Structures are given as structure tokens and as C-alpha cells.
Amino acid sequence: MSGRNNNKLPTNLPQLQNLIKRDPTSYREEFLQQYKHYLSVIEIFKLQPDKPNKELSTLVMFMAQTAHCFPQYLEDFPEQLKSLLRVHHTVMDPDQRMTLCKALILLRNKNLISPSVLLELFFELLRCQDKLLRKTLYTHIVTDIKNINAKHKNNKVNTTLQNFMYTMVRDNNAIAAKISLDVMIELYRRNIWNDAKTVNVISTSCFSKVTKILVAALKFFLGKDEEEKKDSDSESEDEGPTARDLMVRYSTGKKNTKNKKKLEKAMKVLKKHKKKKRPEVFNFSAIHLVHDPQEFAEKLLKQLEASKERFEVKLMHMDLISRLVGIHELFLFNFYPFVQRFLQPHQREVTKILLYAAQATHHLVPPEISQSVLRTIANNFVTDRNSGEVMTVGINAIKELTARCPLAMTEELLQDLALYKTHKDKNVSMSARSLIQLFRSLNPEMLQKKFRGKPTEASKEARIHAYGELDAKDYIPGAEVLEVEQEKTEEPEEDDGWESASLSDDDEDGEWIDVHHSSDEEQQEVADKIQAMPAEERKAKAATVSASRLLSQEDFKKIRLAQLAKEMNNAPGKSVKRKNIEIDSDEEERSGELLSLRDIEHLHKKPKSDKETRLATVMAGRTDRKEFVRKKSKMNPHASSTNKEKKKNKNFMMMRYSQNIRSKNKRSFRDKQIALRDSLLKKRKRLMK
């Protein structure tokens, strides 16, 4: 009898729903009967909206599941649900409210509701004190907007939603404003709303009075963009000379120490230039899309000066301001004295503040301001009363600051810092050497003669520009190599292609001799010819090449290879005094927009760990190990301890006059041997069992 009752369609809605989806026309009457019942239940619910109505929830889900089968009867159904939620969402039962929202999501997935109207309602429902509902609505909003823009960007819907979201971000309800901000950030990260309007709406949240909203907006501008990181990893490595090109060039010839060192030097220079071209993985695009970065940075600084937030939030403010100033090259002179107040070795998170000071420096900052910051760092950090780590951090910060603004360094201060090259602390001396290496490429004339190193073509051309001076070139530096190569190929070949070979005295020492390639000899001849040219003639040839022909990728590759050679070749007229120039690949200057904390905190020599750190490392390595002590199991676990165990725990003063102790101390060497033998035999028998 119970099975027969289950088959009655008016009371068994899941079965009726299944049948309607299969054959809608045959079950129209049953559907209309349920629809009329739904209308009556709606009227009853409106009388007491604060009380849960399970029957209404069941009917609403039934109507939502079958709405696509009878669209002519359910035209007003979505509007009825929206009006119920709009009017009664504050007093409605949470489960009832969730059911109505799920029904609307189901109708939206079937494309029976326009997205703009529904999403506006859902944004209003974010004010509800229901965490599960807010999470569901957040997921649907992000997914729905993603699906709307899947094939192509729907600008009409996007504009409507962005305008509405702009009001929601400024809503008085902190929870609704925070979730609206999270939606915009998520859509930007998914590359759906990545336009300037979205970024500038998010930027307004940086001035919110609610700390959670403020921190979320700051993190958006400071966070890393993972998609950009993946793109940079998959970037083609074919541009420019490769390591294989250098290997081929320097492997042709005798395998001696001189060629090996030349190859190592060339590989270091290549690595340096690869690092310069490597794109940053920070979220630059958002910072670049800010409409008025100068006004934005000024407002942030004003808010920072009057802020009473936690120190971590202040650090985020300083980080964002420094990035804005450094990337957009802004004039924000009040920021530098504010940062200088925190430049003390005992200051909390001082390495980050040093990073922000270097990050906010650029070549347009007046020298008197940047020199003040540099002098503060030198006076507070690079003194003998501080530890080696503090001095190292200070020199690293000075190096990064002067790499961005060379005019900040004075000749007197540079000579004082260069003397730390011979400091007893390895970290300090290596940091000072990296600073010397930086100025060998920027302006060797500021260094003392003993610190300048072997001059190269690149160092001869190095010059620090005056404040505000532009270095605009009407030619591509290094393009003269193309014209010289062309002249070389046009020369008539006088030889018949055969060369005589003889065993020289240098080759009789048993070393391997490789056949010289004609292409390598030609490249060396071209390099020698360019090196012998005066600077003006080089510029003239480079300008002629740049203006008279279109350069291919192969041409640019040759130009870059020639520029690399300038950093290796000796200056004209200089003899080879040193076989190799030391280049620390970890401490090379970078031309990126942002710095990393490792640039400031980098220590060449790892500091010794204290006892607590070593002990913590040892204990961490023992987490997966089992105890090696063999536990003796008793036949009866509840039995009392033996006399032997009691002896071990007995006070020594009670045992010192016992016969066993006295006889033990008076044993002869022979007795001890016998006792040792017996104990070893016992252990052996125990192991053999």
C-alpha cells in the first residue's frame, strides 16, 4: 500500500519532476495543479515571512527545475522570488533564504533571468548576517561574470555591474563592501575585469576606515600576479646570444687555463644581461593603470602620517607609496624624511624599510634629498660599533639606492665605504666589493685608482649624467658591428682555401688542439677592428646603420653580443695585467622596477647558528624516527618494580657503603675483563634467540 501511495504524482514531486522533464506536454495538468498550490503557499508565507515554510521550499525548487519546460506559465516566477528576497531577506529563515537563492541561481544557469538584475540583488543580499549564504553568492557572482565574458567581453553588462559595484564598495555595511571588493579583485586576477576602471575603483578602498577593506586593497597592489609569473617562465629564450654560442666560440682552440677563464667570464656577463631582461613577477599592471598616481601617493602619505593602525599596516602603506614613486618617478619629497625616522638598526622590520627607501629613489629625485637618505643609512648602519650583519645590510641598501640614483653618492663617502673592502668580517668586505664593482660600471673616476680595476671599453664609456640630463641617442649603440662585418665579407678572398699547419713549440706539451673555425677568426678580426676605431667613427657608423636599414633578429643578436664583449675587452692601449675580472653574479646590479628583500638582506657568509637553533634543527629531524631504546616488557604490566630497578633510582648516599659498591670499586683488571666477557656473551645469546 505504501508503494502505491509513493506513485501518486501530486504528492511525489521528485517523480513528477522527472516525468515532466521527459514529456512536458503529457503532464501539463499536473504541473498547473502544483503551480496553483505554489501561488497559494506564497500568499500564506507573506503573512508570516519570519517562520520557515518547508512546503514552500520544496515547491520553489520543483518550479525552478521544471521552469524551462513551461516558460509561458512561469514568466513571473523569477520576479516573485526576487521580490520575496528583496522585501523579507532580513527576517527570513536562513535555510528558506538559501533555498530561494539557489532557485534563482538555477534559473540563471538555464538563462531564464538577465544577469545584471540578479547580480544586483545578490550584491544587496551580501548584507545578510549569514556566512554560508555570502560564500555561496560570492562563488556564483564570480563564476557568472566569468561565464558572461567567456567568449567575448560583454561591455554592456560589465559597465552596469561595475557602476553598481562602485556604490557597493562604498557601502556602509562593512561585510558587503569587503565581499564586493573581493569579487573585483578575484575578477581582475582571473583576467576578466583587468581594465583601468576596475583598478581605480579598487584604489578608492585604500582609504577605507575599515581595516579589513584597507588591507585587502593594499594587498591587491602589493601582491604577486601568478599568471604573469607563468608567462615569464614560458618566455622564449632564443633572443640574444645563448650560452651555447659562447661555448662554441671559446671551445675552439687550445684547452688551457686562459681560455677556460675567458669562458667563465663571458658566461657571468651573459647571466648578468639575462637577469636585466627578466621581467618582474609583481602585479605591475594594476599600479600602471592608476589614473593619477601623484594624487594617489599624496593621499596615501597623508593617511600614513595620521594613521593609528598596526605597524604591519603602516609597512604596507610605505611599500605601496615607494612602488608608486619608483615606478611612476613621482616627486613626493615628504616621504623621504618620514622614512628616515625609522632607519635605525634596532627598528622592527628595518630591512623592509631600507628596501622601501631604495625603491622610492629614482634618477629624478634631487641629489640633496637622496644624499640625506644615504647619509642617514651610512651614519646609523655602517659604523664599527654595529655588528657585521648590520653593516652588511647598510652597505647593501646604499648600493641599491645608488644604482637607482648615482648622484646620491659623494666621492668622499664612496672612498670611505670602499675601505671596508679589507674589513675582517667577510660579509662586510664582500658587500663593499660589490659597491666598488657597481661604481666601476657607473663612474670609475669616483673611485681611487687602486679600486678601479682593469679598464674595459664599457667602463671607458661610462659617465654619470647630470641631474635632469637626458641621454637620448639617435642610433643603436653597437650597430657599427654590422657595417664592419659587411665590409669584411665584401673583401676579395686571396687564398685558395688551403692552409698549412705546423706543430709549434707551444703545442708540443701534450695538450689537445682543436681546429680553428674561420667564423670565430672573422669575429675576432671584427672585434679588433671595432676596438681600434675612434669613438666618433663608431657613433657615425652606428647612426648610418640605424638609419639606412631594417634590422632583423639576427642583427640585434650580433649587436648584443658586441655589447657584451665591451664589458670583457680591455680598453684600447691597455696591456693585460689581470687574466680575469672578478664578477660576483649574485651581486650584479639590476635595472628592474622593484627590488627584492634578498637584495638588502643578502649575506655572503652564512652566520653561525646558536645552540637553540641547532637543537631545534636536530629535533625537527627526529620527528619521523622511532626510538632506538629496547623496552623490556614485563609478563605482568601491573607487577611492581624489581630490586634492580629500585637500585637505579636509589639515592647514592644510601648506596655508597653497600658491599656491591665496595667490591665493584676494588675489582682487579682481570675481574673487569671477565665481567665484560660475560656481558658480551649474554648479549650475543639474546640476539641469537
Swiss-Prot record:
GO (cellular component) term, any one: nucleolus
Keyword Transferase appears in the UniProt entry: no
Cleavable signal peptide: none
GO biological process: protein transport; ribosomal large subunit biogenesis; ribosomal large subunit export from nucleus
Residue ranges of the region described as Disordered: 485-512, 606-689
UniProt-listed InterPro entries: ARM-type_fold (IPR016024), Sda1 (IPR027312), SDA1_C (IPR048292), SDA1_MD (IPR007949), SDA1_N (IPR012977)
Coiled-coil segments on the chain, per record: 254-319
Family annotation (Pfam families): SDA1_C (PF21638), SDA1_dom (PF05285), SDA1_HEAT (PF08158)
Compositional bias annotation for Basic and acidic residues: 668-681
Chief place where the protein resides: nucleus
Record's subcellular location: Nucleus, Nucleolus
Keywords: Coiled coil, Nucleus, Protein transport, Ribosome biogenesis, Transport
General function of this protein: Required for 60S pre-ribosomal subunits export to the cytoplasm.
Entry-linked PANTHER family: HSDA/SDA1-RELATED, PROTEIN SDA1 HOMOLOG
Family indicated by similarity: Belongs to the SDA1 family.
Record-given protein name: Protein SDA1 homolog
Source species of the chain: Xenopus tropicalis
